[in-house]
Amino acid sequence: MAHVGNYSRNGYYPYYNNKFCGNFTELMYLIIVEKNRSDGYSNIKKHLVDNIETINYRNEKGWTALMIACAMCDKWSSFKTIRLLLKKGADVHIENNKGRTVLSLMVNIITENKFNIMDLLIDKGADINSQDNKNKTPLIHACKKELDDTYLHACYVLGKSVDPNLEKNDSKTVRYLLDKGADPNIEEHYGKTVLFYAARMKNQDKAYEISKTLIERGGNANHTNHYAETVLIYLCISCSHYSCELIQLLLDNGVDINHQNRIGFTALMCACINIKNPSNFETIKFMLDKGANINLKNNDGFTAFMNIFGNNYFDYIVPVIQIMLDYGADINDKNNNNVTVLMMAVKFAKNDKNMTVINFLLDKGADLEIRNDYDWTALFYACRYSNSSGNNDAVKLLLDYGANVNVNTLLGHTPLIIACQYADNESNIDTVKLLLEYGANPNLTNLDKNTALSVAITWLSKNRYEVVKLLLYYHADSNTYLYLNSEGTVREYNLLVWIVKNIKCNKLDLLMLLIEHGANYSDIKGYIFQENLDNGDIEKFMKFTNIMENIKLVKKSIIDCIPKRVPEIIFNTNSMISQLLSLKWKAYSSDYKDLITLKDLDIIDYLGVYDIDSLYDRIIDITKYAY
């Protein structure tokens, strides 16, 4: 029974379980409180005598008194009230705001008098094939909702099991509607018939039973909706689990297992995308056994095999990949953009499962050097996405398998340039470092003549300083130029000048870092620094450049001394090299025992020599590069 207060024309009242709305007539109110009072039915009967004109009024949700009485029969109102309303002229054809008639609503209601009520409605002319605002018929609604949601929720809250008789309610309702003339081939607004909804029921046994009944009663198993999807394709798209028995039923009744929808997807492709539990592994194998073509491609060039690969890998993906390969999938097949499964796998290499997949693909012969339409290899994908959807371990794995670290695209981009370009977000510093450790050349240029260093300086902000420092440590040329395309004209910029004019954060640190690694600032006019540095930074910059100038002078003095001092050291009779050469000559002399002096013995002891042979070996090793 409904627990509500007294009636008010402006009040909000429940019209169905815990759903409330306004614009309630007094007749509707009397119906929802009928079982609250012993004279509830009498009050309804008396009210209709003077207010018969309100019998077909609709509330805020478009529900009539008849709809409320039918939906809540045995809970709030009685079966005899329904009979009274129909006798007094309640219209069975009125639609609520969603376009549903009272008969359409009844197919989803759980009540002992459900079929008695439906008999009354049909006897009064209710249309068994009426369509709501989305062209759904009562038969479609019977399969669209397996059991009343409120009933199921109540069972869950109270800890009660679902009544087995009610579990069969949907099947019974479907058969009832078919017996009363329901058409199983009417299409709703997307072109789906009732069979589309029946096949995707959560209860697989029920899905099979009702689908079989619909087909036996004339339902077209080979019908396609507005997207050119068969029931089988729709089933594989919308469900995470489905039975092989149901698939066999559809195939037995004419469904083409290799039919492609409007965008080229087959049922097998959809199953591979929607593979969320181990049972679907058996389903995929079943479809392959039944002749599903593993090498068909959709409009984007993806095969079923390619559709397995995404950003949510699962525990049993490797066996799925293996079964697909066993049935003839090409591990190096490409989509319309020439992307391979290896490229997709490394792009989404975020966790251990994905790394297992990449390892497996490489072991099975996935080609590292295939290029997509951007001329990228798998290594480019790994470097670009190593910090977002990817994984730095994937970069290392590809390099360990022999990926060319200095491969370049038609635009001249290398993996290092790409990693530097995106090192603030999708890539990271560790990827840049890894590439450099594996021999990436930081001085290779793209077609714009830019190196990894110039790209890092112009593209990065958060990690700019660290990446630049890393590149310089690995001998990036600090005197490289920056080339930027401005309105179709490529302009050349000195890196120091560009930094001082365009970078706001840490520009002084970056300038000093480049100069420390040899960037030439002597040709740059001083006013450029003065105009673009803060006063405090100008003072620091001047002190730093003075120190660097002194360091240069010291280095120059050392270098200038080398030609003079080296001969003096080499040819000095007291130098170590001279003494070693003398000892070598003595050792090879036949009377070496007479020639060796006490000073020679000190050298022999220092070298750890224990006999004449070891003396030969040590002296030869030390003096072979002495000339």
Swiss-Prot record:
ANK repeats (start-end): 61-94, 98-130, 153-186, 190-223, 228-259, 263-296, 300-333, 337-370, 374-407, 411-444, 448-480, 491-523
Matches recorded under InterPro entries: Ankyrin_rpt, Ankyrin_rpt-contain_sf
PROSITE patterns from the UniProt entry: ANK_REP_REGION (PS50297), ANK_REPEAT (PS50088)
Cysteine disulfide partners in this protein: none
Domain of life from the UniProt record: Viruses
Species lineage: Viruses, Varidnaviria, Bamfordvirae, Nucleocytoviricota, Megaviricetes
Name of the protein this chain belongs to: Putative ankyrin repeat protein L122
SMART domains: ANK (SM00248)
Keywords tagged on the record: ANK repeat, Repeat
